[in-house]
Amino acid sequence: MDHDNDKKRLHEDSDNSEIKKHKPLDVLSEDGPLTQKDVVYFKKEAIWRQMRSYKQKCTLLTRDLNDIKSNYESNERKINVLDSWYESIINLFGVKKESNVELNETILIQLTNVPIGDLDALLEKRRAQLLTILSPIIENSKLSNIDKSDVLEKIEVLNAEVATLKSENNTLSKLKSQFESKVEDLQAQLLTLVKDNDRRSSKTLQRIDESLTNGSDVKEEASETVKSEVNKDTTVKNENSVDNEEFERISSEIEELKSDNRLLKESMNQINTNYDKVVKENLQLSDKLENLNENDLINSVSYQELAAHNKQLNESVNNLQKINDTTVNKLNELENKQTNVKHLLDKELREENETLKQQLQKSENDLVRIRTARDELLSKQTILKADFENQTTNDELNKLNKVLNERINALESERHETGDNSKISELSKDELIQRINMLNSEIKEIEQAFQETRENSLSKLMSVTDQENMVKKLTIEKTKADQKYFASMRLKDSLSSENKILKTQINKSQELVSKLNDLEKSYLDKIEILTKSNNDFKIIRQSALQENSKLQESLRAIDVRKASLEKELSGMKDKYSDKVQENTSFTQELNEKNLMMGKLEHKLKSTESLLKKYKTNNTSSILQEDERQLEALRSIAKCSVCSKNWKDTAITVCGHVFCSGCTQERLAARLRRCPTCNKGFSANDLLSIHL
């Protein structure tokens, strides 16, 4: 339906474009009563002012939105750069997950939001990678010999910094909220000032104000013209009216004189009665001042107030003294408790420190012993490896020796089998001798080689047996060393578990220390508050004593003043006669003024009676003009449909203004057309205004 209406509007605008170009602008009338065109002009200008205020709000919102967008874009660029840096760091270090390494989850902050999207998944991945890199580095960089005093000092410094930062944060948040509220107030004031400026510069409002002021002027001018016309008519019609006016004037003067006489008599009677009262009161006061008693002083209001104030001050001083004594006792008790707690904590910390140092020394000694045993075992292992290699070479030599012996035996058997006596007999004696010598030399060489090989084999066998014995001994020592190693590892595990327990105890003790530090700070704050209150009480006591002394001095001054007043009384009696004379002069002046007032009142009554006469003759035309102007103003401000409610909703399609109730009723009844021009509108075309 709204889409069809928009189409109709576009069609109508396109058809009537040429007519709108030649259509003259609306003009506000400058004088005379307000017309219907002036009312329409007034409505349009009100809508224009409201649209300008909406535009200003929109510009402010767009400016804020642009600032937020620029901040968002800069933050997104920074996040992308930081992500690339972290990715390059992770790639440089290389992420390799190890099963033995425990991730320290307290290093990096976890994500707080529950729904995990793409960005949250990426951040979780980066966090896991950084934890795998940082946790082993932090574990390796932890020192075993940590000084507790340094740790406690650092904790105290950090706690102090945290407290200061919290206080600064609270103050800054309060300042921020105050500045935000001030900025909102200033924006609202600026908008109201802009609206007021628009209303001041609007022609229609100036025209209405002029019409309202001109209405009163018109009434006065009309009354004056009526008077002049009446006078003219009376002079033309009847010349005897002058005599009537003179008669009325004389009668009014006589009445004025009578009223003046009556006022003079009343004022004289009042003056006489007042004079008698004043004389009596003066005599009574003089008698009282001459004969002042203690009862009069006690019954005096100032004396009672001073006495009550003195009592209150004494009671407050006593109460403050009691409170001071109780606070001093509490302070002493708190100081004693604080010293006892400090001594206990120092004792416990020293004992725990000594036990930890002893356990650490034991573990270091055991570690040195285990390392020496390990080094010995490694050296023996290298020796055994070398001996094992020598044994393999000996086995190979023995195999070679066996092969050579077998070869010699085979050659000898062949020699015996192939040796023919016929050949030997064929040889000569010299050849036989040479051959025998050669054989003897060969036999000697063979025997020598055999002996050498035999000695080598025997020495090798001896060394092998020695090595086997050594291996057996070393295996026994190795088993012993393994047992010692396993025992030391068990001891190491127990020490590591004890170390963890001690670490947890140290953490608990540190938490207790931090809690005790907080308690100490709170106690110190309380002590400071109590000392301040004690000082305040002392100051109050001193001030009370000073006030008491001042009151005593004031009482003495009152006694002195009493004597001086008695002296002044005689002087006052002398002055009384002067005052009586002044009183008579004042009474005369007052009587004269009363006479003047009576005359003026009588003139006012006479003028009012004349005005009533003139108003009864010619006031119908003025009243009709006033009614017309009032109806015009009502038509501007009241709804033309129901004529009950004020106009507060404008239809932006045609510019007509009605009340919100009538527009909503028409929308609910699906009568979506303007009652005056019959143009279609929707709920989006309504605009709330303030006339």
UniProtKB/Swiss-Prot annotation:
Domain of life of the organism encoding this protein: Eukaryota
Disordered as annotated region, ranges: 1-24, 211-231
Organism whose genome encodes this protein: Debaryomyces hansenii (strain ATCC 36239 / CBS 767 / BCRC 21394 / JCM 1990 / NBRC 0083 / IGC 2968) (Yeast)
Family: Belongs to the BRE1 family.
Family matches, as PANTHER family: E3 UBIQUITIN-PROTEIN LIGASE BRE1, RING FINGER PROTEIN-RELATED
Catalytic reactions of this protein: S-ubiquitinyl-[E2 ubiquitin-conjugating enzyme]-L-cysteine + [acceptor protein]-L-lysine = [E2 ubiquitin-conjugating enzyme]-L-cysteine + N(6)-ubiquitinyl-[acceptor protein]-L-lysine
Gene label: BRE1
Main localization category: nucleus
Swiss-Prot/TrEMBL keywords: Chromatin regulator, Coiled coil, Metal-binding, Nucleus, Transferase, Ubl conjugation pathway, Zinc, Zinc-finger
Cell location: Nucleus
Disulfide bonds: none
Pathway where this protein functions: Protein modification; protein ubiquitination
Recorded coiled-coil stretches: 49-83, 147-459, 491-620
Name the UniProt record assigns to this protein: E3 ubiquitin-protein ligase BRE1
Biological classification of the source: Eukaryota, Fungi, Dikarya, Ascomycota, Saccharomycotina
